[in-house]
């Protein structure tokens, strides 16, 4: 066997790469025949029956009075609208069946594009990866000479960068210390001792309160009784004294 024949025999069979269709794509003859077949079958099997049923139902609703009619055209606008909606619904319902026919075509760019569109994951997003996975890549185990070049985790970097700043802080941030180290001791103490040394008021009994009210009442009554006597004495002294026509007391 010649070397050229041996090399040709070992070459793997080349698969034809199908490019996805673009905007200016020209369908092949097989694809055109499938288009015509889909158009005919969707009209006869889906659009026409659904459109006819919609028009009949609409005419029945108009005749029974559920739908109003136009004064000029009657029930024609509503029946025509129902027929158009049924036609479009039939075309849309047959779309999935037409796509399955294109997928069965071999060496068809349109069929290949449809098959690629129904894959679960595209090629640029391989399985097993997620956008919420760990950001830090796993570093493989290195030999002893390269062990120091491994990436340090963020937690240790953060602690090494910001761990030394605690020495420069003027006061201590730990909770175990009794007082800050950089703050002076000229802080006014809380008036706890004054509050404790203040005399506590004894509760007043009912008898003591009644006696106090009685004393207050007697003092008020005494003051009221003394005031008329004093006013009468002042009036008598004023009458005994000689006064002028203006009411002024004349001196002897």
UniProtKB/Swiss-Prot annotation:
Task: List the biased-composition ranges (Low complexity).
Answer: 155-169
Q: Name one Pfam family in it.
A: OCIA
Would the keyword Transmembrane turn up in this protein's UniProt record?
A: no
Residue ranges annotated as compositionally biased, kind Basic and acidic residues, are 198-217, 232-245
Principal place where this protein is found?
A: other
Compositional bias annotation for Polar residues: 7-17, 126-141, 170-184, 222-231
| A GO CC term attached to the entry | endosome
Q: Per UniProt, which keywords does this protein have?
A: Endosome
Outline the segment boundaries, as ranges, of region: Disordered: 1-21, 126-252
Q: List the disulfide bonds.
A: none
Signal peptide stretch: none
- Which protein family is it in? Belongs to the OCIAD1 family.
PANTHER family per the record?
A: OCIA DOMAIN-CONTAINING PROTEIN 1, OVARIAN CARCINOMA IMMUNOREACTIVE ANTIGEN
Its protein name is OCIA domain-containing protein 1
Origin species, per record, is Xenopus laevis
Native organism taxonomy? Eukaryota, Metazoa, Chordata, Craniata, Vertebrata
């Amino acid at each position: 066997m010649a070397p050229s024949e041996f090399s040709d025999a070992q070459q793997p069979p080349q698969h034809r790469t199908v490019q996805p269709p673009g905007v200016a794509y020209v369908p092949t003859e097989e694809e055109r025949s499938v288009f015509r077949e889909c158009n005919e079958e969707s009209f006869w099997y889906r659009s026409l029956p659904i459109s006819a049923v919609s028009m009949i139902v609409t005419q029945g609703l108009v005749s029974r009075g559920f739908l109003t009619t136009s004064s000029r055209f009657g029930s024609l606008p509503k029946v025509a609208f129902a027929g158009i909606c049924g036609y479009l619904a039939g075309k849309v319902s047959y779309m999935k069946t037409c796509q399955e026919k294109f997928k069965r075509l071999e060496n068809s760019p349109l069929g290949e594009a449809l098959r690629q569109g129904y894959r679960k994951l595209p090629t640029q997003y391989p399985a097993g990866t997620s956008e919420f996975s760990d950001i830090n890549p796993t570093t493989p185990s290195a030999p002893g000479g390269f062990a120091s070049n491994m990436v340090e985790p963020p937690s240790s970097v953060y602690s090494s960068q910001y761990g030394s700043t605690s020495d420069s802080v003027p006061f201590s941030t730990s909770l175990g210390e009794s007082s800050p180290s950089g703050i002076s001791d000229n802080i006014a103490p809380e008036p706890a001792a004054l509050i404790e040394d203040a005399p506590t008021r004894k509760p007043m009994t009912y008898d003591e309160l009644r006696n106090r009210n009685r004393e207050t009442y007697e003092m008020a009554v005494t003051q009221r009784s003394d005031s008329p006597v004093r006013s009468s004495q002042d009036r008598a002294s004023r009458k005994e004294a000689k006064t002028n026509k203006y009411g002024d007391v004349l001196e002897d």
